[in-house]
Amino acid sequence: MKPYFPMFVNLEDKRILVVGAGTIATRRIKALMKFGASIRVVAPLFEHELERMEGLDLINRGFTPGDLEDVDIAVIATNNAPLNEEIARMCEVRGIIKNVSSDQTLCDFFFPATIMTDDIIVGICSGGNDPSVTKKARSDIEEYLKEKRR
């Protein structure tokens, strides 16, 4: 696996495109929204949960290459792996960093498991190799932080 630099990014002025609106896309959107991201979602169908979320720009249709105009970050999470790969290649040409749900080798970044308190944010990532290790580490760190606050 390539080494990934753990980096915390201010998303308030970033334009984020999410292609797809299923379970994985919804989970990614929820994570991004916690950090003030401006998110446009392109998909032919939307989960009801997404339709109820405020602050999203929902575009009800399939992806077109023009959707990548003025995008800083792309989250590609359709249920069509060849389409995901095609969009990822378009992002590479345009210099858009991307996360691709169907192929971690195409990802420029991963979504870490996060722990947020009033004064600390912790991100944990196994690079997609072993989610159970990430889950255990998150649980252990959460417990540690709870004990420190007592």
Positions of the model-derived regions?
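Hydrophobic, well-ordered beta-alpha structural blocks that scaffold small-molecule cofactor pockets
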Residues: 1-45, 49-53, 58-61
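Alpha-helix C-terminal capping/helix-to-coil transition sites in glycosyltransferase folds
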Residues: 13, 69-71
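Residue-level detector of alpha-helix initiation sites
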Residues: 23-24, 82, 128
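A structured beta-alpha segment of the ubiquitous adenosine-cofactor-binding alpha/beta core
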Residues: 61-67
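Short glycine-/small-residue-rich Rossmann-like dinucleotide-binding loops
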Residues: 62, 78-79, 126
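ADP-ribose/adenylate-binding Rossmann-like module
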Residues: 73-77, 84-109
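Glycine-rich, charge-decorated loop segments at or immediately adjacent to ligand/cofactor-binding or catalytic sites
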Residues: 107-117
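Adenosine-phosphate binding glycine-rich loop
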Residues: 115-150
